[in-house]
């Protein structure tokens, strides 16, 4: 009996170690640079200390060009947009930067934050990136509402926003009460890798999405909303809702992709690429 109990403890210990080391949805700087080198694209990575926190990002392209900043969803990391950052056509027009949002990748991995707290950590980076040329923000899924928050916190910063399957409508946000169970005690430690901070920030977002509503009025640049009509994770109603809320935007263009799912940055790569090429 005693041996069985010890065996169970050892198994649980090994399981905890395994799940926390797997599925982090991130890539080391050295491996990423190696992959980019194979396609002939120099990659720069950096980690910036901000008090007790750190922000990690990757960059490609000429520093004298207009900038595209990619903001990933949940879970995820900067390399969700690797294909775009390697694209030779995009590189002719843009410098491209992709961040690890707080709690993911190498930006204090595991420490989930509310979106206003995330914005407070991301915003100082723009001072490092300013080059006198336009900045465009591209956000997928939970990266979509991050764009609204960032724009409100940094008035006049961006020339344009592109929301890809962005979650912004409180009425469309699923209750998902099971997330609170997964966040409780030892159960939370059984969640593998990036799923733990993802679960936590999605719990936060159930409240954050309401405080986000008064941020739309601060968006005064042009906005493009792209959404798949068959998105089962973030229903297409979010797209039309965003369009109705962006009353002060310079312009709002809604692009609905028939039959497309939630993963349009990858399943509809050419469509998104052409949208980005036409931004500037």
What are these regions (language model features)?
Residues 60-105:
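Conserved HGGG/HGGXW glycine-rich cap/lid loop of the alpha/beta-hydrolase fold
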Residues 98-135:
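Active-site loop/oxyanion-hole signature of alpha/beta-hydrolase fold enzymes
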Residues 199-215:
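Active-site nucleophile elbow and catalytic-triad environment of alpha/beta-hydrolase enzymes
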Residues 219, 225-227, 231:
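Short beta-strand/loop motif that positions the catalytic acidic residue
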Residues 221, 235-245:
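Short alpha-helix in the alpha/beta-hydrolase fold that links the catalytic acid
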Residues 230-234, 262-263:
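Acidic catalytic loop of the alpha/beta-hydrolase fold
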């Amino acid at each position: 009996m005693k041996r069985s109990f010890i065996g169970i403890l050892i198994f649980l210990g090994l399981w905890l170690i395994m799940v926390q080391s797997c599925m982090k949805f991130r890539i080391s700087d050295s491996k990423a640079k190696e992959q980019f080198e194979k396609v002939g694209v120099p990659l720069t990575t950096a980690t910036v200390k901000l008090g007790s926190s750190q922000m990690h990002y990757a960059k490609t392209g000429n520093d004298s060009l207009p900038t595209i900043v990619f903001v990933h969803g949940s879970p995820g990391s900067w390399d969700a947009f690797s294909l775009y950052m390697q694209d030779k056509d995009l590189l002719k027009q843009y410098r491209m930067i992709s961040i690890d949002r707080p709690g993911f990748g190498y930006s204090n991995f595991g420490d989930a934050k509310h979106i206003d707290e995330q914005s407070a950590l991301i915003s100082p980076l723009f001072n490092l990136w300013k080059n006198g040329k336009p900045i465009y923000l591209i956000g997928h899924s939970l990266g979509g509402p991050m764009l609204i928050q960032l724009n409100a916190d940094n008035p006049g910063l961006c020339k344009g926003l592109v929301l890809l399957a962005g979650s912004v409508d409180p009425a469309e946000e699923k209750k998902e009460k099971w997330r609170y169970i997964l966040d409780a005690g030892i159960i939370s430690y059984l969640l593998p890798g990036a799923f733990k901070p993802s679960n936590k920030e999605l719990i936060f977002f159930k409240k954050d999405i309401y405080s986000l509503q008064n941020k739309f009025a601060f968006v005064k640049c042009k906005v493009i909303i792209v959404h798949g009509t068959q998105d089962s994770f973030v229903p297409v109603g979010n797209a039309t809702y965003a369009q109705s809320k962006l009353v002060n935007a310079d312009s709002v263009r809604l692009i609905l992709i028939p039959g497309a799912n939630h993963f349009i940055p990858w399943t509809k790569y050419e469509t998104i690429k052409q949208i980005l090429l036409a931004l500037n």
